[in-house]
């Protein structure tokens, strides 16, 4: 392996709320502060609801305004 061509591999702290996770990375900054808890993402935690819709006012307003709008392709036009 050639010297001087690879980025430095160092400790990285990931902060989510009051929890801190430690890992190794080539990320240039030593820590990442997460706004949204990745453990509550609806993709792998069906009980948590939709985090984006709960925390984002624009998305919430859109959903209220277009509550009856459907993109279901199975419905036939009458």
Swiss-Prot record:
GO cellular component entries: ribonucleoprotein complex; ribosome
UniProt keyword list: Ribonucleoprotein, Ribosomal protein, RNA-binding, rRNA-binding
HAMAP family noted in UniProt: Ribosomal_bL31_1 (MF_00501)
Signal peptide: none
Function summary: Binds the 23S rRNA.
Family as reported in the entry's similarity comment: Belongs to the bacterial ribosomal protein bL31 family. Type A subfamily.
Any GO MF annotation of the entry: structural constituent of ribosome
PROSITE patterns, sorted: RIBOSOMAL_L31
UniProt xrefs under NCBIfam families: L31
Pfam families listed in its UniProt record: Ribosomal_L31
Gene that this sequence comes from: rpmE
Entry's Gene Ontology BP terms: translation
Protein name per the record: Large ribosomal subunit protein bL31
Subunit note: Part of the 50S ribosomal subunit.
């Amino acid at each position: 392996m050639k010297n001087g061509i690879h980025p430095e591999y160092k400790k990285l702290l990931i902060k989510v709320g009051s929890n801190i996770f430690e890992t190794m990375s080539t990320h240039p900054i030593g820590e990442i502060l997460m706004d949204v808890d990745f453990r509550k993402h609806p993709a792998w935690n069906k009980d948590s609801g939709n985090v984006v819709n709960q925390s984002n006012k624009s998305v919430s307003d859109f959903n209220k305004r277009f509550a009856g709008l459907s993109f279901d392709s199975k419905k036939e036009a009458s």
